[in-house]
């Protein structure tokens, strides 16, 4: 999946993956990670998610990584924030208060960029990537993030043969294999097929949202 795919989705405002409210799983389960105030949290493929502002509101320093400059601009504009913009390596870094959004290719991140990220939040990143890319994504996270990191990951699980994706189905065993060096605990699995007409029309009988806590 090429970067141009996501750039075009944002250009055409085809952003059905964007949620108009803070994710309820984040609000319910994030406190269980027990991160100290001021902890830095990595949010990969963050878009213009409202979750970024929520995390900052919990006293965290937020590092979001997003390919689309349109998404980054929209986040700051929609929150009425003026951002300082500078170049850092392969990324254009936008900052306002405790929120930094790094505009660029996630796979260009280096260990020193996230060395102090002791929190990870993935609501729509791993499910946005096809199988080979998400294996690379999980491997990269495991290699970059410090051993003290704890995280929350939300996935979708459905019959992938019925829809091409994105969003892609990520089976429980695939996530555990991808984060093999982590302790992976499933916190909740919720059947949401009745709220998902696209999947019903494709013939899916089940669509599970799974919530995981990661630590190591």
Curated annotation (Swiss-Prot):
Enzyme Commission no: 2.1.1.67
Entries under Pfam families matching the protein: TPMT
What InterPro entries does the annotation carry? Answer: SAM-dependent_MTases_sf, Thiopur_S-MeTfrase_Se/Te_detox, Thiopurine_S-MeTrfase, TPMT
Q: Which domain of life is it from?
A: Bacteria
Q: Which UniProt keywords apply?
A: Cytoplasm, Methyltransferase, S-adenosyl-L-methionine, Transferase
The top EC class is transferase
Known PROSITE patterns for this protein?
Answer: SAM_MT_TPMT
The compartments listed are: Cytoplasm
Alphabetized GO MF terms: thiopurine S-methyltransferase activity
Q: Supply the SUPFAM superfamilies for this chain.
A: S-adenosyl-L-methionine-dependent methyltransferases
Question: Could you tell me the Gene Ontology terms of the biological process aspect for this record?
Answer: methylation; response to metal ion
Q: Which residues take part in binding S-adenosyl-L-methionine?
A: 10, 45, 66, 123
Catalytic activity, as annotated: S-adenosyl-L-methionine + a thiopurine = S-adenosyl-L-homocysteine + a thiopurine S-methylether
Of the GO CC terms on this record, one is: cytoplasm
Q: What's this protein's family per the entry?
A: Belongs to the class I-like SAM-binding methyltransferase superfamily. TPMT family.
- What is the protein name given in its UniProt record? Thiopurine S-methyltransferase
Supply the source organism for this entry: Pseudomonas putida (strain ATCC 700007 / DSM 6899 / JCM 31910 / BCRC 17059 / LMG 24140 / F1)
Q: Which gene encodes it?
A: tpm
């Amino acid at each position: 999946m090429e970067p141009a795919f996501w750039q075009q989705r944002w250009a055409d405002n085809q952003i059905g993956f964007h949620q108009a409210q803070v994710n309820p799983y984040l609000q319910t389960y994030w406190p269980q990670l027990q991160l100290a105030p001021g902890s830095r949290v990595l949010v990969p493929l963050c878009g213009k998610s409202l979750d970024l502002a929520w995390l900052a509101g919990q006293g965290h320093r937020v590092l979001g990584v997003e390919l689309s400059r349109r998404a980054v601009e929209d986040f700051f504009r929609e929150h009425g924030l003026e951002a300082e913009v500078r170049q850092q390596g392969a990324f254009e870094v936008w900052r306002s208060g405790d929120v930094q959004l790094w505009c660029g290719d996630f796979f260009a991140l280096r260990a020193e960029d996230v060395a102090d990220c002791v929190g990870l939040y993935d609501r729509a990143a791993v499910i946005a990537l096809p199988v080979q890319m998400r294996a690379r994504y999980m491997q990269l996270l495991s290699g970059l993030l410090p051993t003290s990191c704890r995280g929350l990951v939300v996935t979708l699980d459905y019959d992938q043969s019925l829809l091409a994706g994105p969003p892609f189905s990520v089976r429980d065993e695939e996530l555990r294999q991808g984060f093999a060096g982590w302790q992976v605990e499933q916190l909740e699995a919720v059947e949401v097929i009745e709220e998902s007409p696209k999947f019903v029309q494709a013939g899916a009988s089940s669509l599970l949202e799974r919530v995981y806590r990661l630590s190591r």
